[in-house]
Amino acid sequence: MNMLTALSVNIALSTCLIAIAFWLPQLNLYTEKANPYECGFDPMSSARLPFSMKFFLVAITFLLFDLEIALLLPLPWAIQTNNINTMMLTAFILVSVLALGLAYEWMQKGLEWTE
């Protein structure tokens, strides 16, 4: 019963705060806030510069591989098994998936900058 009360109070408080933030916004529009900030100076060009699509693809690939490595590192503690063969098999499967993903990116020329 105590947990139900705490849950209902949390939900009611969250709903109340969201409603207040939705219905009472700040309506003061300042021109300084609408402009991009560039070290205190007026911006020389547009704040939305074009970027290389190759860089974007390499950055996304890096983030995906980095996430997979972050999931691989705590694997021995997450499995909580004393059987070293099971742990090594699971780690080998994850490393194999990483290697296959890297090989696929390499074959699709996703890591090439010169093209």
UniProtKB/Swiss-Prot annotation:
<dbReference type="GO" id="GO:0008137">
    <property type="term" value="F:NADH dehydrogenase (ubiquinone) activity"/>
</dbReference>
<keyword id="KW-0830">Ubiquinone</keyword>
<comment type="similarity">
    <text>Belongs to the complex I subunit 3 family.</text>
</comment>
<feature type="transmembrane region" description="Helical">
    <location>
        <begin position="55"/>
        <end position="75"/>
    </location>
</feature>
<dbReference type="GO" id="GO:0005743">
    <property type="term" value="C:mitochondrial inner membrane"/>
</dbReference>
<comment type="subunit">
    <text>Core subunit of respiratory chain NADH dehydrogenase (Complex I) which is composed of 45 different subunits. Interacts with TMEM186. Interacts with TMEM242.</text>
</comment>
<keyword id="KW-0812">Transmembrane</keyword>
<feature type="transmembrane region" description="Helical">
    <location>
        <begin position="87"/>
        <end position="107"/>
    </location>
</feature>
<keyword id="KW-0520">NAD</keyword>
<dbReference type="GO" id="GO:0006120">
    <property type="term" value="P:mitochondrial electron transport, NADH to ubiquinone"/>
</dbReference>
<keyword id="KW-0249">Electron transport</keyword>
<keyword id="KW-0999">Mitochondrion inner membrane</keyword>
<keyword id="KW-1278">Translocase</keyword>
<keyword id="KW-0679">Respiratory chain</keyword>
<feature type="transmembrane region" description="Helical">
    <location>
        <begin position="4"/>
        <end position="24"/>
    </location>
</feature>
<keyword id="KW-0496">Mitochondrion</keyword>
<keyword id="KW-0472">Membrane</keyword>
<dbReference type="GO" id="GO:0030964">
    <property type="term" value="C:NADH dehydrogenase complex"/>
</dbReference>
<keyword id="KW-1133">Transmembrane helix</keyword>
<keyword id="KW-0813">Transport</keyword>
<dbReference type="Pfam" id="PF00507">
    <property type="entry name" value="Oxidored_q4"/>
</dbReference>
<dbReference type="InterPro" id="IPR000440">
    <property type="entry name" value="NADH_UbQ/plastoQ_OxRdtase_su3"/>
</dbReference>
<dbReference type="InterPro" id="IPR038430">
    <property type="entry name" value="NDAH_ubi_oxred_su3_sf"/>
</dbReference>
<protein>
    <recommendedName>
        <fullName>NADH-ubiquinone oxidoreductase chain 3</fullName>
        <ecNumber>7.1.1.2</ecNumber>
    </recommendedName>
</protein>
<comment type="function">
    <text>Core subunit of the mitochondrial membrane respiratory chain NADH dehydrogenase (Complex I) which catalyzes electron transfer from NADH through the respiratory chain, using ubiquinone as an electron acceptor. Essential for the catalytic activity of complex I.</text>
</comment>
